[in-house]
Amino acid sequence: MDNAPSANLIVLTAAGGWVLNEANEVLWIHRMGQWDLPKGKLEAGESIPECAVREVEEECGLTGVELVSALCETVHSYPLDDATATKTTHWFLMRVAGTPALTPQKSEGISRAEWIPQDDCHFLAGTTYTTLREVEEAAYRAGASQRD
């Protein structure tokens, strides 16, 4: 019996952020009917931290995003064409000065980008992709926010 990996398996690497503004609100995006955190796939020649900052800035129309620290990694699989994609996403705590206006990257299917009060993040994380709860908990462990 052949134990080689299936030719229909695609392995992807991505990075994203739990981004706080000066009001300690968290940046969330609404994409394909779900709340999500900004993230995206690693491009050739860039580091994982560079990818995280680039994706946050591109998806939300920001500049000057500061990477603070690594938070966690999440892994999930999903169908992609006639294959199965397994994506590892590297998450980072990030900060941005002020409370900048956001411009969602509509070409990526992002309909909204919003600063969400931290008190509402636990609810949001519980209504969307299960891996986002892991990111939320890692952010709280890192001291990114205080939850009552």
Task: Identify what each model region corresponds to.
Residues R31-M32:
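C-terminal lobe/hinge of AMP-binding adenylation domains
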Residues M1-G16:
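Acidic, metal-coordinating catalytic segment for phosphate/diphosphate chemistry
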Residues G126-D148:
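Charged phosphate-binding loop/patch that engages nucleotide di/tri-phosphates or the phosphate backbone
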Residues N21:
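Short, acidic, Ser/Thr-enriched surface-loop or helix-capping motifs
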Residues L42-Y129:
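Unchanged
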